[in-house]
Amino acid sequence: MQITVREALRDAMQEEMIRDDKVFVMGEEVAEYQGAYKVTQGLLEQFGPKRVIDTPITEYGFAGLAVGAAFAGLRPIVEFMTFNFAMQAMDHIVNSAAKTHYMSGGQVRCPIVFRGPNGAASRVAAQHSQNYAACYSYIPGLKVVAPYSAEDHKGLMITAIRDDNPVIFLENEILYGHSFDISENVEPIPFGKAKVLKEGDSVTIVTFSIQVKLALDAANILQSDNINCEVIDLRTIKPLDIDTIIESVKKTGRLVVIEEGWFFAGIGATIAAIVMKEAFDYLDAPVEIVSGKDVPLPYAVNLEKLALPSEYDVINAVKKVCYIK
């Protein structure tokens, strides 16, 4: 059976709303319009306006309302039309949601999911194309999820909704319409468990979200040069499954990390630092990081393409760590 990513997300929310009447959805256009990307399609009709709530265009306002509801024992799912707009709500996310469990000595929980599209789409320009994966991963108290397949979106969303503290669920606008095979019964997927999508012994490629497709496509091309790539989908960035990465590096001796976001202070840099510390003796080459260029993402289609990681970039990075010209 195949379903799209948007259907997988909708199904996860629907099932959890049936299972637990404390779960509700709120955000801009999630009810009457059924979501800017139709992820909440059918939920208003099924659960009514008290549990599927349209909000004004005020991320700071409704994020704060949702955090307060979570403190009171409800389980809000907050949809941001894009995580670029979540910048308006950073105080509530970083200072209220992420900190209160610690600052209350464990007395106050904040079971909330912040979800929506993150990163580049297609010609939506610099203010609507930013990738916040590294930004949120930097904050203690937040879990950060960035799946690729439909099944992982569903299983990880179920886990996120059931979590007793805040989860940042980073989706991708382009992936919403992609179809994937999915199991008949999808179980919750634990956080911090990466997935090896392709086994190999030449080089380890680590990535997440839509860049998984880029990694798999590049790996298939490199196969013709007898370079067997092991491709790892992180699925969750925080907690990070460093054990799976290190076990792979012990086998391959080489590591390439792909991320759509910028290089400086990025996820690739963090993974490289950990691997250099924990598995230095197993490395046969310096770690390579393929990332977005250090510019605001352009609107022009030719410049946008140049600013984002490409198959060419990945293939070159893999050949570099394999010392192949």
Swiss-Prot record:
Pfam families to which the protein is assigned, alphabetical: Transket_pyr, Transketolase_C
Residues that hold thiamine diphosphate according to the record: 59
EC number, UniProt record: 1.2.4.1
Swiss-Prot/TrEMBL catalytic activity: N(6)-[(R)-lipoyl]-L-lysyl-[protein] + pyruvate + H(+) = N(6)-[(R)-S(8)-acetyldihydrolipoyl]-L-lysyl-[protein] + CO2
Summary of the function given for this chain in its UniProt record: The pyruvate dehydrogenase complex catalyzes the overall conversion of pyruvate to acetyl-CoA and CO(2). It contains multiple copies of three enzymatic components: pyruvate dehydrogenase (E1), dihydrolipoamide acetyltransferase (E2) and lipoamide dehydrogenase (E3).
Assembly: Heterodimer of an alpha and a beta chain.
Protein name in the entry: Pyruvate dehydrogenase E1 component subunit beta
Organism encoding this protein: Rickettsia bellii (strain RML369-C)
